[in-house]
Structures are given as structure tokens and as C-alpha cells.
Amino acid sequence: MARIAGVDLPKKKRVEYALTYIYGIGLKSSREILEAVGISFDKRVHELSEDEASSIAKKIQQSYLVEGDLRKKVQMDIKSLMDLGNYRGIRHRKGLPVRGQTTKNNARTRKGKKKTVGSK
């Protein structure tokens, strides 16, 4: 099992799909990496040599923000929105949908379990 960017890649999958197991790398960027390094998309992870795996890891480290660093950056971006106190930051702080979705009937995932308010 190849280990790239702190993630164990599944042995039997094709490399282009296995790289998507790394947080921050999708199918498009995985194909760009393989093209830049010169490895076939059809190759399986267990068929990779040590040199190929290290060249992939080197390319990812040079060009992409992945795993913990990317998660940290996303959290910092959200925190800065909340500190600024703009609309998106307030929505994050309140735990409501940020991108303009309606909240009258839906948004249960974001709002949590229904809190019934009794009336007299």
C-alpha cells in the first residue's frame, strides 16, 4: 500500500482514482499530477515503483495544499469571516445555511433537531 501525503492509498485501484483519497485532490488535479509526472492513468497503485510514488508525492508537496494544511486554511477562512462580522460570518456563527438557502421549512441538517416552542 503506497503512502502519499500521510494517506494510505488502496492497492488495487487505478492511481488516478486512488489519489482522490487525499483531501484536497480531486479527479482533475489527480490527472494533472499524473500527466506532469509522466505516469499512465491506467496504472494500479500496487504497480507503482518507489521512484514513481516519490515523484507523485514530491509534485503534490510542491504544487498543492492538502490534508491537514488545507483543513487548517479552511477553518481559518471561516474564522476570519466570523471575526469580520459580515453576513456569511454571522450565518456560520448561528449555524444556519450560508449560501442563501431558505430556512422556513428546510435546512434541518444545518439547524439541527427541531426545537418545538409551546404556546399557551
Curated annotation (Swiss-Prot):
Belongs to the universal ribosomal protein uS13 family. Keywords: Ribonucleoprotein, Ribosomal protein, RNA-binding, rRNA-binding, tRNA-binding. Pfam families: Ribosomal_S13. It comes from Helicobacter acinonychis (strain Sheeba). Residues 107-120 have a biased composition (Basic residues). Part of the 30S ribosomal subunit. Forms a loose heterodimer with protein S19. Forms two bridges to the 50S subunit in the 70S ribosome. Located at the top of the head of the 30S subunit, it contacts several helices of the 16S rRNA. In the 70S ribosome it contacts the 23S rRNA (bridge B1a) and protein L5 of the 50S subunit (bridge B1b), connecting the 2 subunits; these bridges are implicated in subunit movement. Contacts the tRNAs in the A and P-sites. Residues 93-120 are annotated as: Disordered. This is Small ribosomal subunit protein uS13. One of its GO terms (molecular function) is structural constituent of ribosome. GO terms for cellular component: cytosol; small ribosomal subunit. PANTHER family: 30S RIBOSOMAL PROTEIN S13/40S RIBOSOMAL PROTEIN S18, SMALL RIBOSOMAL SUBUNIT PROTEIN US13M. Coiled coil: none annotated. HAMAP family: Ribosomal_uS13. One of its GO terms (biological process) is translation.
